[in-house]
Amino acid sequence: MGLTAKLDKLKLKTTSEDIEDDSGHAKPDNSDDIDEVDSEYQNILLSIIAQLRPGMDLSKITLPTFILEKKSMLERITNFFQIPKLLIDSNSIEDPLDRFIGVLRWYLASWHISPKAVKKPLNPVLGEVFTCYWDELPNNKSAYYLSEQISHHPPKSSYFYIMPEEKIRVDGVVIPKSRFLGNSSAAIMEGCGYVTLGKWDNEVYVMNQPNVYVRGILFGKMRTELGDHMYVKCERNGLEANIEFKTKGFIYGTYDAIEGIIKDSETQKELFQISGKWNEVMYIKNIKTGKKEVLYDTRGSKTLKPKVRPLEEQWDFESRKLWKPTIAGLAKRNHELATEEKSKVENEQRIKAKKRLEDGVEFHPKFFREVNENDNGVKNLEYVIYKKFDLKEDPEVLRERLFTVAPIVPGQKFDEKFHYPAFKKPESN
């Protein structure tokens, strides 16, 4: 049986009966937490994997829909911004070392926000965009996010986040590279993020991501692990953190543990130790005094989900609208429908890619332009938002400038230049 036939077999089984409300509508909020890899699905997955070789790139392999999350990677990135109070609190701290610890706390706190079951976000198509906003932040503050898939092979997702009243911005790119490792698969998370605190004279924090592993593909129970090293660095204040996300050994060890240090970048003197579990309680210990306290307890964490414009106001290539039929199938656990709708989107993109190749047309992002010599300190991003955002400006000026990039809040209209390539648009109003 070929790979396509094995995937088609997934269409024969669907279990939507138990997840519909009285009106017949699917309940989408909890289906990502349902582990659907039963014995039949596991056998199908095993048949697919049997055709792979260790180290093989998985980016061109069509995975069965039962392991897909009901959101695009462009939306998944917003997990970083769903505990905004921690970032706001960090921005109010006078002491540079304590402020660094606050930013580290905010970043580490976000990793537990994920489906309970093993789920992979939908791969964004080239040119796909996602925008959202938060209008219920503390003290009536607001935040905005926009992202775009700037490359498909390899996949690259650029994003921009701004909290105008706090004068905080985050620029970043996520570059996942999937590999098959035998009983595991790995998403090697390349890319990085830059957090800029305008209140502190544009103090910048640079950070990367741990890698993501799915264990138990061939035998054992499937589960997700974060692994390897993550760093946070602030060159201005000469501080850095190196955090190891420990993976469980075959015999010894525990799941989800972290261990790391905060140190002085110049002297290499270790100042604090970090320990605990990234999805439970994390601790920080002052090496000089020996005092140990809770850095963050995820078990009491409250998240603020992003808000989006109504679907009828969205462009066809905005994530929620583009993947709506696929997400509907996933919500009902109707994998025949989900596979069919997902294939429609992907086939359309292949046709467009072929047409661009035949016509000699190069793709250019709408929101992000290539980094140039004037973009100090963000060379690793490759692309940045094309508009200039000076955090010293009034919050309302920053907000209105952002709204000229793309509609983000309900009621906004598309500008006539929306479809122009970013490099052809003016960086200021």
UniProtKB/Swiss-Prot annotation:
InterPro entries: OSBP_sf, Oxysterol-bd, Oxysterol-bd_CS
Family: Belongs to the OSBP family.
Protein name: Oxysterol-binding protein-like protein OBPalpha
Keywords from the named record: Lipid transport, Lipid-binding, Transport
Gene symbol of the encoding locus: OBPALPHA
Extra remark: The C.albicans mating-type-like (MTL) locus contains, in addition to the genes for the regulatory proteins (MTLA1, MTLA2, MTLALPHA1 and MTLALPHA2), a and alpha idiomorphs of a phosphatidylinositol kinase (PIKA and PIKALPHA), a poly(A) polymerase (PAPA and PAPALPHA) and an oxysterol binding protein-like protein (OBPA and OBPALPHA). OBPALPHA is not represented in the genomic sequence of strain SC5314 because that haploid assembly includes the mating type a allele of this locus.
GO terms for biological process, alphabetical: lipid transport; single-species biofilm formation on inanimate substrate
Pfam families named in the record: Oxysterol_BP
Gene3D superfamilies noted in UniProt: 1.10.287.2720, 2.40.160.120, 3.30.70.3490
Gene Ontology MF terms in the entry: lipid binding
